[in-house]
Design a protein with these regions (language model features):
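A glycine-rich beta-to-alpha transition motif near the start of alpha/beta enzyme domains, typified by
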Residues: 1-129, 168-289
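C-terminal domain-closing interface element
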Residues: 140-144, 149-153, 158-160, 272-289
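Short, charged beta-turn/beta-strand-edge "cap" motif at the junction between a beta-strand
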Residues: 118, 139-140
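Short, solvent-exposed secondary-structure boundary/capping segments
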Residues: 129-137
Length: 289
């Protein structure tokens, strides 16, 4: 008899994944499953597969593994982490972690173990429903650009790692992502491949003497292993950091992606990047393996 896997499809700003609770069941070959299930014509259709599990270390409450549509394993996904927060809170009864009372809302924290470390999720809850999630994405890692100097292709952008590598190009034509994203992802300068963002400052532009408190940045993404996606949480964070580093914006930005808006703050106090955005259920289902 064929084994059936229960799954939930969710999305964060259109960045959709298949979520499987491995505390209740197992996926024997997640790489192969990600390829087959992500197919939008012959499978469920998604940008990849996310496995939710128990944390093997005491520093975290739960764990996440994420596989791209091509079967490769990703270090981190901001949109998926928000969806996991909503999934866990709304599908776990009783809720095992402390809940704080706010003015008309509740808040709870989840420590989520990823391949790029433990991330803290702050869930904003109204009437038992998670309305939005803020994720402490940690400190950005600024790549050493000396190896790229003199390269006509790679001297126009900014390199930022948010647990996975991003190359951000500011341009007046964000639709270039469809033409050049694939080539840049696999450029020889990126032996592990790279996520590519094309970004345009829409409002809150700065001068040399001042930086806007809050910028709006239109961004399109080519995700490593998945291609063009509706949104990318770590890509939004990388874009906001790159804008601040290059003097195009201050430390707060709204990143407008194809699938929605993410609010990003790069705080001076701890040098951490905080991402806030929605998470939505699409449907539950079962699939044979």
């Amino acid at each position: 008899m064929a084994q059936k896997i229960r799954f939930t499809k969710m999305h964060g700003c259109g960045n959709d994944y298949i979520y499987v609770n491995t505390m209740e069941q197992s996926v024997p070959n997640p790489q192969e499953a990600a390829i087959r299930w992500s197919d939008r014509h012959k499978g469920i259709g998604s940008d990849g597969l996310v496995l939710i599990g128990k944390s093997p270390v005491p520093e975290a409450d739960f764990s996440m593994r994420i596989f791209n549509a091509d079967g490769s394993e990703a270090m981190m996904c901001g949109n998926a982490s928000r969806c996991i927060g909503k999934y866990l809170y709304e599908k776990t009864h009783p809720w095992p972690l402390p809940v704080k009372e706010g003015n008309g809302y509740q808040e709870t924290e989840i420590r989520l173990l990823t391949l790029s470390g433990v991330k803290i999720l702050y869930l904003h809850i109204v009437d038992g429903v998670v309305e939005r999630v803020t994720v402490d994405m940690g400190e950005p890692v600024l790549e050493n650009e000396s190896q790229f100097l003199g390269n006509r292709v790679l001297d126009k952008g900014t390199f930022v790692s948010m647990g996975n590598p991003h190359y951000v190009i500011f341009t007046d034509d964000v639709d270039q992502v469809g033409e050049t994203g694939r080539a840049l992802e696999r450029h020889p300068a990126f032996p592990q491949r790279c996520n590519i963002e094309f970004a345009q400052i829409v409002s809150g532009k700065t001068t040399d003497k001042t930086k806007a408190d809050h910028a709006t940045i239109r961004t399109r993404v080519w995700e490593r292993g998945s291609g063009i996606t509706e949104a990318c949480g770590t890509g939004a964070c990388a874009t906001a950091v790159a804008a601040a580093l290059t003097g195009k914006a201050g430390r707060k930005s709204d990143i407008v992606m194809d699938g929605g808006v993410l609010s990003i703050e790069w705080r001076k106090a701890d040098n951490h990047v905080y991402m806030t955005g929605p998470a939505e259920f699409v449907f539950d289902g079962e699939i044979e393996i």
